[in-house]
Design a protein with these regions (language model features):
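Juxtamembrane helix-loop junctions of ABC transporter transmembrane domains
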Residues: 13-17, 44, 52-68, 92-139, ...
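Membrane-integrated ABC transporters
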Residues: 1-53, 68-88, 103-107, 111, ...
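Helix-loop-helix
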Residues: 70-71, 177-191, 265-353, 358-359, ...
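Transmembrane helix-loop-helix hairpins at lipid-water interfaces of multipass membrane proteins
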Residues: 39-99, 179-184, 286, 293-318
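An intracellular "coupling" helix at the cytosolic face of ABC transporter transmembrane type-1 domains
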Residues: 33-36, 131-132, 148-157, 161, ...
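Hydrophobic alpha-helical transmembrane segments of ABC transporter permease domains
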Residues: 25, 44, 99, 103, ...
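Internal alpha-helical transmembrane segments of multi-pass membrane proteins, especially GPCRs
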Residues: 40, 44, 83, 87, ...
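ABC-type nucleotide-binding domain
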Residues: 75, 375-511
Length: 511
């Protein structure tokens, strides 16, 4: 069974329940570096689509004014203008639809390509990690990074980030339009912005915090399940069923609590934001009605008046109020959309943090210079060769540039070796032994005595804390790990078959 992370210690990559903006920034940079051309086109389409999406609000004011004029002075002169305005607004919506279709299709390609590259990077990194990493990290937790965490990236890259940018630009454009039409009504909108900000900070912030915790709890639970599945026979042999169930219940309960809190806050968040938007709509309509019915007692201050009439104060028209109410709806809808996407972003940041944690792990170091080569003997001298001779030699380059060769014989010696899987707990003390070429040696002892540990040290799966291990008189730290392991034959206690033919499993790595 794999070694589990001790109770009370967070696994590698665990977050603290807060969204890390450094991780988000790194994620965005990584996506852009992988697909700079695609994302440049996407950004252009989003900006144009957002700006065009704001324009119809202005046309609503124009169309409403034309209808008012048609009702009072007749339709003969107004109908051509009204028709032109309607067709222009329809054309704007059509262009916005085309731009949206283009960038969503591009983002689908970018998302799947980015996930593909991320999985490749993770797997390549995993192949270069030392054995100690897999001892400290449950395999199920690593698998969760390949599945759940990458899936959270899919949603945020394909939907959340484009929506955040689009909605953010739309909100900015709508606010500018609101300032243009009426400064007094803008004060009502500012009140709504304050309420929405408080709701986002208090409710949305808590939801995001628990979504991050949910992602980490899910990784822990899956790691434990995978460990129990692989070690079920050991659990049965040692009658560990009840203890395993208690451990699982603890992890499952924690996952339940985190998921419950995350979804509880997320589920009440959108209704609250929606009702704040509805209340803002009513207050805006009420304030607009007061400005219209005040007969100039309450002046409407606007940039529009300054541009069209030369004065900043003028009565508010019904058409302006109608346009303003449409912008109000558009504003609240986009603010709610931005707030809703933050939960998905929080989950993705938690997943991205765990993925980057894996990618940032220090690969297994190898400072060896001695390599293994095929050889033959000529007049008592070892000579390297390319053909198969059944003989191998250690090849070492001296300081003067000449090559020294030493025949591979299999002489292994330990000199006062100390070792511990963790620095503060030594499991081998002053071990000295030798195995001469051709000699058969057996390590006999109870489980945990260190038999497998000694073979792991010979292969340099772990580095010793003190002492020396020499192989044919060469310090194994000076031998390249690939060549060292190539010279050794290992038969594992547990049989592990990879997907493929029997021959491929026998050859394993020499295909």
């Amino acid at each position: 069974m794999a070694n589990r992370v001790p109770h009370g210690k967070a696994p590698i990559g665990a977050g603290r329940g807060k969204m890390d903006f450094k991780v988000l920034n790194r994620l965005m940079k990584q996506v852009f570096s992988d697909y700079p051309v695609h994302l440049t086109i996407v950004l252009i389409c989003i900006v144009l689509s957002a700006l065009i999406g704001v324009a119809p609000a202005a046309y609503i004011e124009t169309i409403t004014r034309y209808i008012e004029e048609g009702l009072t002075s007749g339709w003969a002169a107004i109908l051509p203008k009204l028709t032109k305005a309607l067709f222009t607004m329809a054309a704007l919506y059509l262009v916005s639809l085309i731009l949206t279709t283009i960038y969503t299709q591009l983002m689908a390609h970018v998302t799947q390509g980015f996930l593909h590259k991320t999985r490749v990077r993770m797997f390549s990194t995993m192949q270069r990690l030392p054995i100690s990493y897999f001892d400290q990290t449950p395999r199920g937790d690593i698998m969760s990074r390949f599945t759940n965490d990458t899936d959270s990236l899919r949603q945020v890259v394909s939907q959340s980030l484009p929506n955040l940018l689009s909605c953010g630009l739309t909100v900015l454009g709508v606010l500018c339009m609101m300032v243009y039409y009426s400064l007094p009504l803008m004060l009502v909108v500012i009140l709504g912005i304050v309420c929405m900000t408080l709701a986002t900070k208090n409710i949305g912030g808590k939801s995001a915090k628990y979504f991050v915790r949910q992602q980490n709890s899910l990784g822990k639970a899956e790691g434990f399940i995978e460990e129990m599945m692989n070690g079920q026979k050991v659990v049965k042999v040692f009658c560990h069923e009840e203890a395993a169930k208690q451990d699982f219940d603890r992890l499952n309960d924690q996952l339940f609590r985190d998921a419950r809190e995350a979804n509880r806050f997320a589920n009440i968040f959108m209704p609250i934001m929606g009702n704040i938007g509805n209340l803002l709509y009513v207050l805006t309509a009420f304030a607009g009605g007061l400005l219209i019915t005040s007969n100039g007692l309450i002046p409407n201050l606007s940039i529009q008046n300054l541009v069209t009439l030369g004065t900043i104060a003028a009565p508010l028209s019904i058409s302006a109020v109608a346009s303003y109410l449409g912008m109000c709806k558009q504003f609240t809808a986009n603010v709610s959309q931005v707030s809703q996407q933050m939960n998905a972003v929080a989950m993705a940041v938690a997943g991205a943090g765990r993925i980057f944690d894996l990618l940032d792990q220090k690969p297994e170091s190898d400072e060896g210079t001695v390599t293994l080569t095929r050889c033959r003997e000529e007049n008592g001298t070892i000579v390297p060769c390319a053909e198969r001779t059944g003989k191998w030699a250690w090849q070492h380059q001296k300081d003067d540039g000449t090559m020294e060769y030493r025949l591979l014989q299999g002489d292994v010696r330990f000199f006062d070796v100390d070792f511990g899987y963790v620095p503060d707990k030594t499991v081998l003390h002053n071990v000295s032994l030798y195995a001469k070429p051709g000699q058969k040696l057996a390590f006999v002892g109870a489980t945990g005595a260190g038999k497998t540990t000694i073979t792991n040290l010979i292969n340099r799966f772990y580095d010793i804390a003190d002492g020396k291990i020499r192989y044919d008189g060469i310090n194994i730290n000076h031998i390249k790990k690939a060549d060292l392991r190539h010279s050794l034959g290992i038969v594992l206690q547990d049989v592990n078959l990879f997907t493929g033919t029997v021959m491929e499993n026998i050859r394993s790595g020499k295909l």
